[in-house]
Regions:
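Walker B catalytic acidic pair
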Residues: 293, 299-300, 311
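Basic, amphipathic alpha-helical bundle interface domains used for macromolecular binding and assembly
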Residues: 41-46, 61, 68-78, 283, ...
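Residues immediately C-terminal
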Residues: 112, 296-297, 303-304
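P-loop NTPase nucleotide-binding/switch module
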Residues: 169-206, 210, 238-288
Length: 495
């Protein structure tokens, strides 16, 4: 047979489109041409494939080889196409039987000696392969990742010769058994580590229960970072589908992640906009996507470049980020929970009782203006974190651990899911009218607050959402005036 077709997958955002590798062998001067919008790593595969075929004991044809990667308008990058290209050549030259690979897809980079090397995006590719009802052949190092999918046939090999022996019926490769991933629910941080700070701890619990964004403000050393790092430990565990969704993102990004834990990302304040939202010629996920279904913590918020912070405004509302390129748009999920921390002034000690702050009123104003009003308006809870007194630090009275707080958060979660099918932070204005019914006292209270604090419509709705969460934590169907009062206290003077 002089023509062969092999199936593989590309990566486009979080999708894995099907790619057909067509190999044609014809008479002519020995050459190997790859067409179909192949990028550098794919074009270089011709040398790896030639050496791998020869070193695996097969013949590399001394004829004209044309390899077409279809569809032609889809960019192909990475070295995962090495294995399908090599197998296509072997089938087209009659060294492997025809049609035995029809219900298979192949990914894998080839070493010069024929060994298979691991590739990125395995889980995303495996999920697409499963939907297509195909089997998957891949490098041994990627087997456990792909085998997380139930009822999916995965074949793993160390060497090109091993793959060929499987299809020659010389030595069959066993199906990799489905891996029941051990969910790592043990967090190294616990809220019991935090001394004092009852009000900030309460705000953290409310944020966890309703999925709300939160801003901690206070001088250095008061526990802002400590509190933020405890948030994942009080959040409900991811369900199996969410686990796979998060794992596929980290697979594409080629980044380590503890399976079963909610992501916690804390980029440095020198991070660029591309590092935060993602990008590149073939766009890759940024920090907000890596924090999907988890927590994005921005410490020293005013130290971030203002343009970098402004890119957060759209994904905070839409829960996704769209990256546009000349030929296409890539959409990445960005359903993260924003937790931020900041000092009140450049030195950090403004409004402190010990009068250490030497910053002028103008410098304090300039420092705080680095964060735009529209961004602050999108943060649900604003909370001051005061310095701890000596007796609070020395207090040995046991405080609530994360497991205890998480029980209350889980209960509030269930109330919300049963009532409206989602968390309170995502309630639309129409849903607010249905699920947030205020009595006469509360209505007067919110009207007065709107006038005094000059609340925007967005801030008004966010206060109602927070009050709904506080009521859910109290297991109350109706929102009481005490719930609304507490929600207003977390709004501060920013609106």
């Amino acid at each position: 047979m002089s023509l062969a077709k092999i199936y593989t997958r590309g990566l486009l955002g979080l999708h894995a489109p099907l790619i057909e590798v067509e190999v044609h062998v014809s008479a002519g001067l020995p050459s190997l041409t790859i067409v179909g919008l192949a990028e550098a790593a794919v074009r270089e595969s011709k040398d790896r494939v030639r050496s791998a075929i020869i070193n695996s004991g097969f013949q590399f044809p001394t004829k004209r080889l044309t390899i077409n990667l279809a569809p032609a308008d889809l960019p192909k990058d990475g070295s995962r196409l090495d294995l399908p290209i090599a197998l296509g050549i072997l089938i087209a030259t009659g060294q492997l039987p025809e049609n035995v690979t029809d219900d298979f897809e192949f990914i894998g980079e080839l070493a010069l000696d024929g060994h298979l090397r691991p590739v990125t995006g395995t889980l995303t590719i495996a999920m697409a392969c499963q939907l297509a009802k195909h089997q998957l052949m891949l490098p041994q190092e990627n087997a456990d990742e792909a085998a997380q999918l139930p009822e999916f046939k995965v074949f793993a090999a160390h060497h090109l010769k091993q793959v060929c022996d499987h299809f020659l019926n010389t030595q069959k490769i066993e199906v990799t058994s489905t891996q029941k991933s051990t969910l790592d629910k043990q967090y190294k941080f616990d809220s019991a580590d935090v001394k004092g700070q009852l009000r900030p701890r309460r705000a953290l619990e409310i944020a966890a229960a309703g999925g709300h964004s939160l801003l901690f403000k206070g001088p250095p050393g008061t526990g802002k970072t400590l509190l933020a790092s405890r948030l994942p430990s009080i959040l409900p565990a991811l369900n199996p589908q969410e686990n796979l969704e998060v794992a596929s993102i980290y697979s594409i990004a080629n980044t380590q992640h503890h399976f079963g834990q909610r992501p916690f990302r804390a980029p440095h304040h020198t991070a660029s906009a591309i590092a935060l939202v993602g990008g590149g010629s073939n766009p890759k996920p940024g920090e907000i996507t890596l924090a999907h279904l988890g927590v994005l913590f921005l410490d020293e918020l005013p130290e971030f470049d203002k343009k970098v912070l402004e890119v957060l405004r759209q994904p905070l509302e839409s829960k996704e980020i769209i990256i546009s390129r000349a030929s296409r748009q890539i959409t990445f999920p960005a359903n993260f929970q924003l937790i931020a921390a900041m000092n009140p002034c450049p030195c950090g000690y403004a409004f402190n009782q010990d009068s250490r702050c030497q910053c002028s009123a103008e410098s304090i104003k300039r420092y705080q203006s680095r964060i735009s009003g529209p961004l602050l308006d999108r943060i649900d809870l604003h909370i001051d974190v005061p310095p701890l007194k000596a007796q609070e630090l020395q207090d040995t009275t046991p405080v609530e651990d994360s497991a205890t707080v998480r029980e209350r958060v889980l209960q509030a979660f269930h109330f919300q899911i049963q009532r409206q099918g989602g968390l309170n932070h995502a309630l639309s204005p129409k849903q607010l009218e249905k699920h947030v019914v205020l009595d006469e006292t509360s209505q007067k209270m919110i009207e007065m607050a709107q006038q005094r604090l000059n609340l925007s419509a967005r801030a008004y709705h966010r206060i109602l959402r927070v009050s709904r969460t506080i009521a859910d934590l109290a297991q109350s169907e109706q929102i009481q005036s005490t719930h609304l009062t507490e929600a207003l206290s977390y709004r501060g003077t920013q609106s």
